[in-house]
C-alpha cells in the first residue's frame, strides 16, 4: 500500500516539475507577440530587433551583424542566463533601463514566461 501511495505522489508531482521548465510548443504561441520584431529558427535574420537564435548564454548586445542595439544594452555587460531572460520577458526596462525595445506590456504570466524561455532556448540551429 505504501508503494502505491508513493507512486501516486510521484505521478502527481511530475507535471509540476515539467511545467516549471516550460513547454516549448506553448512558448511558440507566446513568441508570436515577439515575432513582429524578432525572428528565430532556421534562416532567421535580424529585423527591427535582432534574431534571437542561440541567445541563451550570449552576452547582451552582441548578436553578430546586428548594429541597432541601444547604448544601454551594449553597455549592460550581462550574459543572457535563464533568470535574466525571464526577468527581461517580464519587464525589460527593469533589467536594462534605457533600452530601445518597444514591448511595454511584458509577459505577465509566469507560465508564459517559462514557456517562452523553453521555446527560445530550442531555437539554436546547428
Predicted regions and their residues:
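Positively charged n-region of N-terminal signal peptides that target proteins for export
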Residues: 1-4
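Structural micro-motif
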Residues: 97-99, 113
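Histidine-centered phosphotransfer motif of kinases
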Residues: 119
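N-terminal signal peptide c-region/cleavage motif recognized by signal peptidases
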Residues: 13-17
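Thiol/disulfide oxidoreductase modules built on the thioredoxin-like
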Residues: 101-108
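Sec-dependent N-terminal signal peptides
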Residues: 6-9
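Periplasmic/extracellular electron-transfer cofactor-ligation site
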Residues: 22-79, 87-97, 123-126
Amino acid at each position: 500500500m505504501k508503494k502505491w501511495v508513493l507512486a501516486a505522489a510521484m505521478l502527481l508531482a511530475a507535471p509540476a516539475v515539467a511545467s516549471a521548465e516550460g513547454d516549448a510548443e506553448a512558448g511558440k504561441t507566446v513568441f508570436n507577440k515577439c515575432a513582429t520584431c524578432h525572428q528565430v529558427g532556421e534562416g532567421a535574420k535580424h529585423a527591427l530587433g535582432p534574431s534571437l537564435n542561440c541567445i541563451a548564454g550570449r552576452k547582451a548586445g552582441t548578436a553578430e551583424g546586428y548594429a541597432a542595439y541601444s547604448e544601454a544594452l551594449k553597455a549592460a555587460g550581462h550574459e543572457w542566463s535563464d533568470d535574466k531572460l525571464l526577468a527581461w520577458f517580464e519587464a525589460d526596462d527593469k533589467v536594462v533601463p534605457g533600452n530601445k525595445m518597444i514591448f511595454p506590456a511584458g509577459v505577465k504570466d509566469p507560465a508564459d514566461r517559462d514557456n517562452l524561455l523553453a521555446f527560445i532556448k530550442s531555437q539554436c540551429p546547428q
